[in-house]
Amino acid sequence: MDIKILNVGKQYGSVHITKALDSVSFTVKNGEFIAIMGPSGSGKTSLLNIIAAIDTASEGNVFFGDFELTKASAAKLAEFRKNNLGFVFQNYNLLDTLTLEENILLALSLNKQSKKEMLERAKELQESFGIYGLRNKYPHEVSGGEKQRCACARAISNNPALVLADEPTGALDSHSAQILLETFQKMNTEMHTSILMVTHDVFSASYAERLLFLKDGKLVKELFRHDKDRKTFMSEIYDELSI
């Protein structure tokens, strides 16, 4: 399913108007991995929140296939989020009172599967992300990288159309960040998951197929990785940021 963002704008205030987004347009093709970069206040979080149906656009439209996000009712949006979106946050958002496996099972329970189906799917995901041996551990008993891999497993448990990641490596050390980014790459290439990731980190952005630059609420530049290796793409990103 392609996701189309068409002339999306967002403004706050009625007297003193602040424009967070200004006519932003792009398409996330099915199975694409896109990173978004930009300085603080450039509109990255506002854009992610609108695509996630957490916030509404002041103008423009967002389409997931034929479904128009910006005109849907609150009830339809809630159902849409449950069935089509996965989320990975900087602070993991795992429930501390549940084991890693139970955190994944909780997400699976929203889809009315049988207990056997949920356990099989949870095992499959945990094995794929290398955390099956930690299934009975609680979040405070594992590392930040292991928590984030659990968050990734939870995010794709219901096969979402799109995973939204907001600074997912922000709280991780360099080794854990690399493992997580390789996990994202696996989600994208092997599981064909579409990913939209907001990041300040050039190393993280270099794992994407395409990079969007936001500045003052506008989409000002796109870089495509094409067949470049990651190090070459990373160097190209640094060159762009130095201009």
Pin down the residues of each PLM region.
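ABC family nucleotide-binding domain
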Residues: 2-214
